[in-house]
Amino acid sequence: MEESQAELGVEPPLSQETFSDLWNLLPENNLLSSELSAPVDDLLPYSEDVVTWLDECPNEAPQMPEPPAQAALAPATSWPLSSFVPSQKTYPGNYGFRLGFLHSGTAKSVTCTYSPSLNKLFCQLAKTCPVQLWVDSPPPPGTRVRAMAIYKKLEHMTEVVRRSPHHERSSDYSDGLAPPQHLIRVEGNLRAEYFDDRNTFRHSVVVPYESPEIESECTTIHYNFMCNSSCMGGMNRRPILTIITLEDSRGNLLGRSSFEVRVCACPGRDRRTEEENFRKKGQSCPEPPPGSTKRALPSSTSSSPQQKKKPLDGEYFTLQIRGRKRFEMFRELNEALELMDAQAGREPGESRAHSSHLKSKKGPSPSCHKKPMLKREGPDSD
């Protein structure tokens, strides 16, 4: 085959070239040349060294470098419980200390609203919440006002109220003064001091008491609540109370008052919903003093006014009916209605008079066995 192609002078296609021809096409400094094999041999240890090393350490395996230990996931932080639960009982003291709030409705646009029936403040995250301080007589100089949050339910009271880890790490709403873990802040007061009690671990914020301005009867402090009530890792839907105390310069108590707080997205809606539920439960009715007798509420049947009897219509109407069969049907229907009126006792005298009038007007009813005789008039009759 090759000889025949050589004789004809036709070159074979590439697929028909021999292996020797392809080998000659490779460059001289190929990967399989002996020049590149020498450095590789130098990298390998001599056989004598390997034998010596195995004889010296027969029981030791080659030690591989240990991989760096993976950073273990940090466990959930368990904050220490407080051994001190502050009192939440209202104490006006000698100065008649009490709190007040601005009147606001339940519109969706409100950012802060107070419910007097619930003694509860509804507000949005980091929004201004004005709290009024009322006193009957001015307290001594150096008096301070402290605000502290505690959990309302008994099973949570020993836990410290703090912000959620998400809000603690967030740089939003950071003023550079308040610690990131504090829930309550004071807005617009550079004299505010934030305390972390070393013994009770409670968080509080203290501001100096300022006398009311001219033509004003109360002092107003603007608070901010820096975490939602529904935040996981924080309040986690647990109700909280804010305790406002009036203290002298030595920390002695002069007055105390408290209110519940809910930090939510729509304060007006939540206030309206909780007040409706409160009224449905009947808790809005004040309890009678001890020793007083409760009056039973009248039953609904006796309290409801009696329905007035509608007088029977005394008018009479004449209805022309075509066909005796239809007439009998309407007559029976009318008698049934008259009987119902008589049994109901509505205007019995008038019903009897009305039925007698119908009988006299109708005349004797034809017998069902006798066919009434009707005179047929022909076309010639007058």
Swiss-Prot record:
Residues 88-359 are annotated as: Interaction with HIPK1. The record marks K108 as: Interaction with DNA. Residues 348-352 are annotated as: Interaction with USP7. GO terms for biological process: cellular senescence; circadian behavior; DNA damage response; entrainment of circadian clock by photoperiod; negative regulation of cell growth; negative regulation of DNA-templated transcription; nucleotide-excision repair; oligodendrocyte apoptotic process. Keywords: Acetylation, Activator, Apoptosis, Biological rhythms, Cell cycle, Cytoplasm, Cytoskeleton, DNA-binding, Endoplasmic reticulum, Isopeptide bond, Metal-binding, Methylation, Mitochondrion, Necrosis, Nucleus, Phosphoprotein, Repressor, Transcription, Transcription regulation, Tumor suppressor, Ubl conjugation, Zinc. The modification Omega-N-methylarginine is found at R322. GO terms for molecular function: ATP-dependent DNA/DNA annealing activity; copper ion binding; DNA binding; DNA-binding transcription factor activity, RNA polymerase II-specific; molecular condensate scaffold activity; promoter-specific chromatin binding; RNA polymerase II cis-regulatory region sequence-specific DNA binding. Residues 1-44 are annotated as: Transcription activation (acidic). Residues 245-283 are annotated as: Interaction with E4F1. This is Cellular tumor antigen p53. Multifunctional transcription factor that induces cell cycle arrest, DNA repair or apoptosis upon binding to its target DNA sequence. Acts as a tumor suppressor in many tumor types; induces growth arrest or apoptosis depending on the physiological circumstances and cell type. Negatively regulates cell division by controlling expression of a set of genes required for this process. One of the activated genes is an inhibitor of cyclin-dependent kinases. Apoptosis induction seems to be mediated either by stimulation of BAX and FAS antigen expression, or by repression of Bcl-2 expression. The modification Phosphothreonine is found at T18, T273. The modification N6-lactoyllysine is found at K108, K127. Residues 262-269 are annotated as: Interaction with DNA. Residues 272-316, 341-382 are annotated as: Disordered. The modification Symmetric dimethylarginine is found at R324, R326. Residues 354-373 have a biased composition (Basic residues). Residues 101-225 are annotated as: Required for interaction with FBXO42. A motif ([KR]-[STA]-K motif) lies at residues 359-361. PANTHER family: CELLULAR TUMOR ANTIGEN P53 (PTHR11447:SF6). It is found in: Cytoplasm; Nucleus; Nucleus, PML body; Endoplasmic reticulum. The modification N6-methyllysine is found at K359, K361, K371. Residues 104-281 are annotated as: Interaction with AXIN1. It is linked to p53 is found in increased amounts in a wide variety of transformed cells. p53 is frequently mutated or inactivated in many types of cancer. It comes from Ovis aries. The modification Phosphoserine is found at S15, S20, S33, S37, S171, S258, S304, S381.
